[in-house]
Structures are given as structure tokens and as C-alpha cells.
Amino acid sequence: MEHRGVTVWLTGLSGAGKTTITKALEQELRSRNCEKLEVLDGDIVRQNLTKGLGFSKEDRDTNIRRIGFVANLLTRNGVMVLVSAISPYREVREEVGRQIGNFVEVFVNAPLNVCEERDVKGLYKRARAGEIEKFTGIDDPYEPPTNPTVECRTDLESLDESVGKVLGKLEELGYISN
């Protein structure tokens, strides 16, 4: 499938469903023969590209800017990039979106209590116990997008519905064909 380069940036709290939606999107796009496709997962990026950064606001912003830099390079070379990263601060997300241009912001929205119930990594429990400082949603803010391109309410809709919303928007914007 031929398509224009675009970055699809999934943002939301830990446990909201970003990685789950990203993996399902990747699978669906590959089944449609989308060959120029890359995934930048925040957890994997932190182990490689941004290793050594902490969780201060400055370090988080640096992390997002670096992910954005790589996504921009890929996007301008015709690659569809799926980014899955908490990216808690609105200002730096908007900055990265402006730099990339072909940017689809997907707000993966689930209430904090739902994310805590899902807590597959045990991070919320550790944050509540004081073992993790500056944890997004607990003692560090998450600033939701003011006008996301797509909002997926993962507490109210199925995975297929969320993926369908994103694919539908990519089709509507001309990034993929149906």
C-alpha cells in the first residue's frame, strides 16, 4: 500500500492502552501491505535512544523531543510512524506535532482508576507506596490534549473500535486507502 509519511502519536497515561492499540494498528496496517511502517515505543526508546534520562520535566521533554526528531526523519521520508509514549506535557507534544507536520495525535483516554486496575507493570502500586517519584498521574501531571485528532476511550470501547477510529481518521486524511 502506498501512503504519505505520517506520525501517529498515541499519548495517555500508563495502562491506558497505547501499546495495545499500537500493536493492533501495526498488525492491521501490515496486513494491508503497508511496508514503510515503523513503531517507536516509549519504553523501548528509553532503553536505547534516551538511556540515561531521568523523569524530571526537562528529561521527559528531552525524551519526547528525541522521539519526535526520529519520527520526523522517518515521516519526511515517506514512512508511517506509530509512536506510543506517555508524553505527559501538552506543550512539547504540540511542538513536536508542529515540527513533524503530518501528525495525527491520538489521545488514548482511560480514567486513572482504570489505569491503576490494569497496572500490568505494577508501577502505580509502587508509586502509591512512594517507591517511584514523579510518576505521571500520581505525583506528576498528565496534560490531556486540548484538541486531539482522535480520542480512544479504552474504558468504554473495544480494541477493535479504537483501532477502527484511528484507521478511519487515517483514511479520511488520505494517509491510507481503505
What is each of the regions a protein language model found here?
Residues 18:
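Conserved lysine of the Walker
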Residues 10:
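Hydrophobic anchor at the beta1->P-loop junction of P-loop NTPases
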Residues 109-112, 117-165, 173-178:
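Small-molecule kinase domains that catalyze NTP-dependent phosphoryl transfer to phosphate-bearing small molecules
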Residues 14:
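The conserved Walker
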Residues 39, 103-105, 149-151:
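Conserved beta-strand scaffold positions in the cores of enzyme catalytic domains, especially
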Residues 1-5:
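Phosphate-binding P-loop
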